[in-house]
Amino acid sequence: LSGGIDSPVAAYRMAKRGLALDHIHFASPPYTSERAKLKVKALAQKITPYTGSTNLFVVPYTKPQEYIRDNAPDVLFTVLMRRSMMRIANIIARKQGCEALVTGESLAQVASQTVKALQCTDAAQDLPILRPLIGMDKEEIVTVARRIGTLETSILPYEDCCTVFTPK
């Protein structure tokens, strides 16, 4: 649950199909603020009517992110960060008895969401990855977010760990 528009919609769509969900959020203080974490908690609350009771795991991600930033070429930063997140999510999911990971990715919405990039992040762990938004465009996702009541919270301007170190 990143704090953006897509992940709550992905959770909603999977809950609609009967999937029980836990959420994982990656926080990178001091680069991400307490307000950003509160935003994610608010989003988790807003989708509770659809998902039922869930756990929210907040993963401190500053050190891995700094390590990748300091040691990887800029061109690989995003894919290496996503692979690292997938590995961590896999560990948490297995400990919780989860059978799959769910992401809010949609194909080719951003450069890290090409088929090749998705294959690369998938290969970092061994659970099935469900992507309920894969064929949706941003307008369709925003329409669902508005309908389920998450859009206004999702667009609050707090930083998330996926963008704070993105190479310029």
Residue ranges and their predicted role:
Residues 1-38, 162:
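ATP-dependent adenylation/pyrophosphate-handling site
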Residues 9, 35-42, 59, 76, ...:
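Conserved active-site and cofactor/substrate-binding residues in soluble primary-metabolism enzymes
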Residues 23-25, 58, 103, 131:
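Structural beta-sheet core signal
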Residues 43-71, 158-161:
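A conserved beta-strand->alpha-helix junction
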Residues 65, 71-143, 147-148:
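Active-site adenylate/phosphate-handling loop in enzymes that bind or generate adenylated species
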Residues 149-157:
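A short alpha-helix-loop-beta-strand transition element characteristic
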